[in-house]
């Protein structure tokens, strides 16, 4: 389209980054396969010290695809993947794509009720998870359409030396799966490829075909499945590399952001594998392990949420570390405070890195990032400039009327990474995706921001009531619904409390049902109930009992008042 139709003040400030690209129109697997044919001997990823070449990876993906065909997975079928960043997750993700299926990506630490919801909402016919999560899946399986449950183990992907150590430590803690359990163990599953008699197990898919389902709160804060296409992911890969002209084939990305997150899957995994990079897979994040891998592998690119960078600053093991290999350090998932950016930029300088942290912004409705601070031009507090072929408007909230430069409004996004739809939800799809007179389909983000005269974007806040804890989106309404369902609870309200490490932590206020005592025992009953029904990252750190909830004039719970009261408590405690 002509840039004259949409205001693009950023076009003169892109530096080496082009305004437009030609996009690959095949499947995600085909994008990776092209690279594998070009650089078969290059390392695709390294997992706990064991490296896999592109040639080996493609062979494993094709074997996995044949096994999927053997168990009956067909074009358009959904397969749920609930895995950490490990080789089997990568093989399964691309194998599902290869047979024409749709990968339904979920958090392996999800609570039982959430797993049941994800399996049913997607109508998944198969699911793959780790042995340590087997029990949660087995408890809900009979209430879903899942025919085949595939169980992998981290130990199967380890080198013999590392495996021995793993089995003496972490491996000992995992409960043994019964021999007669109705599951297929990973090794047995892969052997099923020998029984695949389909000549055409590879299904040709187009760029516009649905390929992945990721989950987010949508515009109302209730969980929505976001349907993303092959082109969404392939375009993102090309955009990310275009926005980083310093990238070279073989460059290493530390992949600690999880696979069920657009940032982790889209940037840390698919961008690297579709453009010739190398992923250093981190299955379970700790700041200590993250820091160790950066130094050990001389990583070129790292990505994380602000809490990660806050943690790295405090690590004694980083003293004297040489980070001169770094070409790009990206922050997303939450606002990066000016103070933290300054601290981490100094940290990078002190550790011989000649770069700064570059902040980005995006939504799951656009896979992940759609704008990024350019490497040649930093503006304090800005989240950067749009990627090639991505357009950003700032409008009066919920309208198509653009506001002047420098004025706050709702952030709208358009471009090749815009989702296909919300799964089975045409009403919210229509509310979020709207076509304007310029012919573009725009995502109404519900986020507030400002654009300056040079096209730099400044994030101002989330219009929706959402808590961000360690980069994860936590929707208060979901936790309130769970709490309110307990017989002890009459009413609840959940808020985010500022936390120096997590940015925000979750706190619940509860008005108890008549006759229920406000005791420590009652609190522990409710905390145990939450642990069973709420994902680990969304778990309230505290429950406070209230005789009554503050209300607004229209009778709604005044959650902002509770937030203000909590902030006042924190301030008073700090002044003591």
Language-model segments: residues:
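AMP-binding/adenylate-forming catalytic domain of the ANL superfamily
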Residues: 3, 152, 532-557, 575
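Gly/Ser/Thr-rich phosphate-binding loop
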Residues: 299-304, 313-380, 391
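Conserved AMP-binding/adenylation subdomain of ANL enzymes
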Residues: 234-252, 260-303, 315
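Conserved AMP-binding/adenylate-forming core of the ANL superfamily
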Residues: 41-86, 90-94, 111-116
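Conserved pre-ATP/AMP-binding loop-to-beta segment of ANL
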Residues: 176-215, 222, 246-252
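Conserved ATP/PPi-binding loop(s) of AMP-dependent carboxylate-activating enzymes
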Residues: 385-389, 401-433, 474
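AMP-binding/adenylate-forming catalytic core of the ANL superfamily
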Residues: 110, 127, 302, 415, ...
């Amino acid at each position: 389209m002509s840039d004259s139709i949409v205001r693009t003040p950023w076009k003169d400030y892109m530096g080496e980054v082009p305004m437009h690209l030609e996009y690959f129109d095949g499947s995600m697997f085909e994008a990776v396969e092209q690279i594998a044919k070009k650089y078969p001997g290059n390392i695709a990823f390294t997992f706990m010290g064991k490296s896999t070449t592109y040639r080996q990876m493609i062979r494993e993906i094709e074997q996995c695809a044949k096994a999927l065909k053997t168990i009956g997975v067909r074009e358009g079928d959904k397969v749920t993947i609930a895995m950490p960043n490990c080789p089997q997750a990568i093989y399964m993700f691309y194998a599902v794509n290869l047979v024409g299926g749709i990968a339904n990506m979920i958090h392996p630490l999800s609570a039982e009720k959430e797993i049941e919801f994800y399996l049913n909402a997607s109508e998944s016919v198969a699911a793959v998870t780790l042995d340590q999560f087997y029990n949660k899946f087995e408890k809900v399986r009979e209430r879903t359409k899942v025919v085949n449950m595939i169980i992998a183990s981290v130990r199967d992907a380890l080198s013999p030396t590392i495996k021995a150590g793993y089995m003496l430590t972490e491996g000992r803690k995992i409960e043994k799966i019964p021999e007669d359990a109705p599951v297929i163990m990973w090794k047995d599953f892969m052997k099923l490829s020998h029984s695949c008699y389909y000549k055409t197990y590879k299904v040709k898919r187009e760029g516009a075909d649905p390929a992945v389902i990721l989950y987010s709160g949508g515009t109302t804060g209730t969980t929505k499945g976001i349907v993303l296409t092959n082109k969404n992911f392939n375009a993102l890969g090309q955009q990310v590399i275009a926005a980083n002209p310093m990238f070279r084939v073989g460059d290493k990305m530390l992949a600690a952001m999880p696979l069920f997150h657009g940032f982790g899957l889209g940037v840390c995994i698919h961008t690297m594998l579709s453009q010739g990079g190398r992923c250093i897979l981190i299955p379970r994040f700790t700041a200590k392990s993250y820091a160790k891998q950066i130094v050990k592998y001389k990583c070129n690119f790292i990505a994380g949420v602000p809490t990660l960078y806050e943690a790295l600053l405090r690590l004694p093991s980083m003293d004297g570390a040489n980070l001169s290999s770094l070409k790009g350090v990206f922050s997303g998932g939450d606002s990066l405070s000016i103070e933290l950016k300054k601290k981490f930029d100094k940290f990078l300088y002190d550790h011989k890195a000649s770069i700064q942290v570059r902040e980005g912004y995006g939504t799951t409705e656009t896979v992940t990032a759609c704008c990024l601070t350019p490497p040649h031009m930093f503006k304090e507090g800005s989240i950067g400039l749009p990627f090639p072929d991505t357009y950003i408007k700032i409008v009066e909230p919920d309208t198509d009327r653009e506001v002047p430069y420098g004025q706050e409004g709702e952030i709208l996004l358009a471009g090749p990474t815009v989702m296909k739809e919300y799964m089975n939800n045409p009403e919210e799809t229509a509310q979020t995706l709207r076509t304007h007179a310029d012919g573009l389909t725009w995502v109404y983000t519900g986020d507030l921001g400002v654009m300056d005269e040079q096209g730099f974007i400044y994030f101002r806040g989330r219009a929706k009531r959402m808590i961000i804890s360690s980069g994860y989106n936590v929707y208060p309404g979901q936790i309130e619904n769970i709490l309110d369902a307990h017989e002890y609870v009459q009413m609840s309200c959940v808020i985010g409390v500022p936390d120096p490490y997590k940015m925000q932590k979750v706190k619940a206020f509860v008005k108890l049902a008549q006759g229920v005592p406000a005791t420590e025992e009652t609190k522990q009953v409710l905390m145990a109930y939450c642990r069973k029904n709420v994902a680990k990252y969304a778990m309230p750190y505290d429950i406070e009992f209230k005789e009554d909830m503050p209300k607004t004039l229209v009778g709604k719970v005044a959650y902002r008042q509770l937030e203000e009261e909590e902030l006042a408590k924190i301030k008073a405690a700090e002044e003591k």
